[in-house]
Amino acid sequence: MNLHYLIQEPKIIHEKNPVLILLHGYGSNEEDLFSFAPELPNDSYVISVRAPYDLQPYGHAWYAIHFDADENKFSDNEQAKESVALIASFIEEIVKQYPIDTKNVTLIGFSQGAILSYATALTYPEKIAKVVALSGYFNQDILPEVIDTKAISHLKFFVSHGTVDQVIPVDWARKAKPALENLGLKVAYHEYPIGHGVAPQNFFDFKNWLLR
């Protein structure tokens, strides 16, 4: 495997089971979102992936974030694109290793993981069915120059954000819905009165959305 991961096997076994792939945020690790696993749909594999870049003294990132002298923040978009390709090849590997329904692959990303979930789904739509993007934003700079709207037409998105998020402003998150709808996609968009995190109601709402 090209990426380290934790896995929870489904409790209800089908010939092929859905998979929920969890992508953590900057500076975190695969154990963070895996705490959701016991509460997620029990017919699904739950796989929580560790990002490839080590941070000091601990934690991991999908791509570097740099600051200039004025504290402006810059994402390493080339690294981000490389991580998108890594996630796509990781999906190819796990569907060979486990009896996974390749038509039922969901990405659940938080923060930096959400940013990459958007990009992975729109770059490799044949591998993804649904995206849950928690506390992230839609980064146009890491998307393909040309998006085939027919190839992505099956994709469904659940997008949520905290209205008092100090890490990624809610205004950034709000741009995702019109951007995705302009591509002809269905988007469920929710806001919660919290900061940079996942409120219990947020979890409840995206879990119910997954079960539809």
Role assignments for model-derived ranges:
Residues 4-13, 17-100:
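Serine-hydrolase catalytic machinery in alpha/beta-hydrolase-like enzymes
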Residues 126-138:
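A conserved short beta-strand
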Residues 158-161, 165:
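Short beta-strand/loop motif that positions the catalytic acidic residue
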Residues 34-36, 145, 169-179:
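Short alpha-helix in the alpha/beta-hydrolase fold that links the catalytic acid
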Residues 109-113, 117:
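Gly/Ala-rich beta-loop-alpha elbow adjacent to hydrolase catalytic centers
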Residues 24-26, 108-110, 162:
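Conserved alpha/beta-hydrolase "nucleophile elbow" surrounding the catalytic nucleophile
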Residues 171-212:
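C-terminal catalytic histidine-bearing segment of alpha/beta-hydrolase fold enzymes
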Residues 99-109:
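Alpha/beta-hydrolase fold nucleophile elbow
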